[in-house]
Amino acid sequence: MATPKAAIETMDVGSSPIERYQNVLGAEAWSEFSDAFSLLAERLRGRVVWNVNSTPRGGGVAELLASLIPYSRGAGIDERWVVIEGSREFFDFTKKAHTLLHGVAPDGSDVTREERRVYEETMQRNTGPLLEMIRPGDVVVLHDPQTAGLVAALAAHGCQVIWRSHIGVDQPNEMVRNAWRWLRPYLVDAAAYVFSRRAYVWDELESAKVHVIAPCIDPFTTKNEDLDHASVNAILRASRILPGPDGEATFLRQDGAAGRVRRAAILSTTVPADARLVLQVSRWDRLKDPAGVLQGFAEHVAPRSDAWLVLAGPSVHAVDDDPEQPGILAHLEAIRSALDPPIRQRIVIAQLPMEDIDENAAIVNALQRRAYVVVQKSLAEGFGLTVAEAMWKAKPVVASRVGGIEDQIEDGRSGILIADPRDLRSFGDAVLGVLADEAKARSLGQGARLRVLRQFLAPRYLKEQTELVSSLVA
């Protein structure tokens, strides 16, 4: 019996002019940036650059693709984005693989024979439709473990295949190495491997194929565009996070059209208009440690300050490739419910609407700009786009010294790093130190914005990726 074909989703990404960065970059950097695109367009000669991942929304990979592909298209590159289809069993397994690659076994086991069968069957179901869309000679960028099993078929089809890993750990344990051993055979035929940090590169990969490209943010996206104080408040009122009438809750969409916030967040309680906010934005993911943030705030910040905590994440059923989220959210709500009322009322769990991705981005933007301190107390982190987003908005950030966060924050200059993310007292003391010292908060925020300006904006990422693709099609 033939394997049924998957329904591949093609994303509408539009185009954006690279010229908007001309005033951000110096003359020399702008020339190098624009020349890289010109060279690639010449070398591609009508071939397409494809990006393949497993979800259209709700995570850092989807955000990167949505914001960066339009620049390639605006520069004359035919770059596209498609999303594979998978069953609940597939996403249960790939979530497990994700945590194994961070050194954590959620169910205490390695990869089973049945899980491998589900994975390979899903890859087979998606291969046929992809080969009907993608031509020999095209370049295909496959993102994360969910797509690793597609490498061989696409390479045999005559494509230049890049496998892009957005996750990793600084010090791999045996669980991580076992996950590498399971995935490595799928990747042999890739033309290149891209990691976010040198420390994340796997053992036994062909070194000549390995490249390191750190992620970035785009300051012109809906999530990062400038918002004045009135717009911030209007957006947060329209989403029911702050009390009061909606006002003009407008924002600029990714395609340049005007948008308006119309949907409310699902909240445990509303935030007072004058509250000082400690904010973490993330998926409902155990590796982001929202439970640790909640407990650290309740035990060490709330009793010694007037601050409120907002834990913000996506509407719990909106992210297809992360089936653990409902259970983690329920656990958070149980922890909050058990707290004494005076502390409980200052902790807000907010599920943000996801039906309109630009609307969601506008709400996150407003929350980050409204926050007094932004935290990211991850137990593991590939890069941590929410850190760079808050830094760009000149917010003081308190975050774990893990993964790509350590690359972004210079401790004491552009944020504060917590050496042990499980040390709730140190976390609380760091947050209190910022809340209690306005000059320190301002200085850290200014240093944070400058750090992102110099190291983590889109042109650097786009130039490095464009040069890699150019080298493969020369």
Describe each region flagged by the PLM:
Residues M1-A474:
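Catalytic cores of nucleotide-sugar-dependent glycosyltransferases that transfer UDP/GDP/TDP-activated
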